[in-house]
Amino acid sequence: MDNDYLIKKPPLQALFLFSLPMIIGNLFQQTYTMVDSAIVGRYVSEQALAAVGASYALTNIFICVAIGGGIGASVIVSRYFGAKEYGRMKTAVFTALLSFLGISLVLGVAGLFLGNQIMIWLNTPQDCLDMAAQYLRIYFLGLPFLFMYNVLSAMFNALGKSRIPLYFLIFSSVFNVVLDIIMVTKMDMGVAGVAWATLIAQGISAVLSFAVLIKNLNGLEGKQKTLFDTMELSEMTRIAIPSILQQSTVSIGMMLVQSVVNGFGSEALAGFSAAMRIESICVVPMSAIGNAVSSYTAQNIGAQQKDRVVQGLHAASKMVIICAAVICFFLEVFNRGMIGLFIGNEGTAVALSTGIGYLTFMGWFFCFIGFKMAVDGLLRGAGDMKMFTVANLVNLGIRVIIAITCAPRFGIAMVWCAVPVGWFANWAISYAEYRTGKWKTM
């Protein structure tokens, strides 16, 4: 397939072909994190599942920083690629890699010192606090690998080669699951085994991805003037910061909301954590569609084909509707079996009812996050970041305020009632900005 199919093929076909490898790859990524939780929940204890879940909200913020930063950098790289300015594109790629390597090292060191205290601030139940802190310490050691893998994947996506990260992710996922089984069920390492398995698998994937990216860049004409350009970094930062906010909105909100859930005890936290793992899989196709729209928009603007951008959003909306219908069916019909994968027959009634209640309610509202991510992807790809950022902050604010003010009084169900309200508000603001047409002049 030609690398420039995003600017040549019909919009629906182009978006489908581009997003499909990302969907498959992200499903593998989420599947092995789900396996992490399922293994500790079934083979260690319900408290171990709660510990990994308590850590998940914080660790997912770092994942979102890496993904959001990669998306911001990929917009610039996509524009240069669409305009066939390969020399500037290579400079942008290396600037992104060096920048995020430095950021990951700083965050990793900070996390080693502050991770345990953050778990305390988040009101983590005492019976799983030590395990959560142990998991975090190992996780922060592998933060550079996490950042580099996600940024490298974004670079491949910007070049229209979204299949390459998929191949490495499949390898990493399978290897991670094998290590999980060995370290937890055979070596009895508990939550530490899960953390080490993730670190090793991501490290290997990052190194291999870097080697293949260099080979692909060497095959393109044009030579970069320097390995690091502050002007390119400035432009990437302008787009990356709102992208990071957008990617982190869910996770920051989840972390703050989880502090409320933690107050209901480790049993409720275990059920909530299981539901979060399943929700993360359900969000994958919506996120991939949004990321595909972002690269599609950036390349078509770079190729002076803005009329195709509008067609692309319409095509993405059709994809969202289909995905949302499938997700709703599975969550409404199979919610009990899904939660049972993590908790098993020995799980407490509180854990089971919490997880099932969340999935049953949320199944009806995934169209909101899909529409939100599609229009957000267009604005991000066009560089229209102001209202994009406002919309995502409103989303975060609504979710946190409703959960913190209403859950203690009306029960834990208010935690998930707040989620679709935030999604809808985010979409409404972003769509209104899209309708103004300002994105065409960015």
Walk through the language-model features, giving the residues of each.
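N-terminal transmembrane alpha-helices
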Residues: 7-44, 57-72, 76, 101-108, ...
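Helix-terminus/linker motif at the lipid-water interface of multi-pass membrane proteins
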Residues: 31-49, 119-126, 182-189, 248-277, ...
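Transmembrane helical elements of multi-pass membrane transporters/channels
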Residues: 17-36, 138, 172, 201-205, ...
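Short alpha-helical transmembrane segments in multi-pass integral membrane proteins
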Residues: 1-19, 77-142, 186-241, 297-364, ...
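Short runs within selected transmembrane alpha-helices of multi-pass transporters and secretion channels
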Residues: 70, 139-157, 165-173, 194-207, ...
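Transmembrane alpha-helix boundary and packing residues in multipass membrane permease domains
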Residues: 22, 26, 38, 75, ...
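Small-residue-rich hydrophobic transmembrane alpha-helices
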Residues: 49-109, 146-165, 271-329, 333-335, ...
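Hydrophobic transmembrane alpha-helices of multi-pass small-molecule transporters
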Residues: 61-64, 176-180, 206-210, 281-284, ...
